[in-house]
Amino acid sequence: MKKSLFATGLAIAMALPLGAQAADYVIDTKGAHASINFKVSHLGYSFIKGRFNTFSGDFSFDEKNIADSKVNVVVDTTSLDSNHAERDKHIRSGDFIDAGKYSEATFKSTKVVDKGNGKLDVTGDLTLHGVTKPITIEAEFVGAGNDPWGGERAGFVGTTRLELADFDIPVMGSSSYVDMELHIEGVKK
């Protein structure tokens, strides 16, 4: 009797659609299919754009139950790159992000809200410059499917604005904030 109940339970579990369960992904930084970019005003006349070259993370995503999705990212702040070595050295210094003391920034989601049509609000705790604050990333599901190497992938884009004072970072020139743009592609585990 126990064997037949076990077999029945196993058969039911195997018959459940795979889409009914969240899938876990590793962010594809090795294949350069993900980026964390920033844009900050330069003296109020133009913008400086840059990126963080080194980061890692993972996410769990279920199209049928968005609220169960999760995101975790770790950014190496010493990898900040604005395509200008002297400026990068200054931004990484104690005058601004103090990457020597705070070499990592982390984001851990606490809530994902489905806004419809592939749009999501991803709220979580960002730790930057030794300060942890809640932020919301306005994200969009780009798509998911098989890749040419036999794996499965899912991709998202997102934006958020960070107020520097919220993280005890001095104002950079005339800008009190930095705009972040995220391109995230994950490979299913």
From Swiss-Prot:
Transmembrane segments: none annotated. InterPro entries: Lipid/polyisoprenoid-bd_YceI, TTHA0802/YceI-like_sf, UPF0312/YceI. SMART domains: YceI. Keywords: Periplasm, Signal. It comes from the Bacteria. GO terms for cellular component: periplasmic space. Residues 1-22 form the signal peptide. Its main location: periplasm. It is found in: Periplasm. Belongs to the UPF0312 family. Type 1 subfamily. This is UPF0312 protein VPA0850.
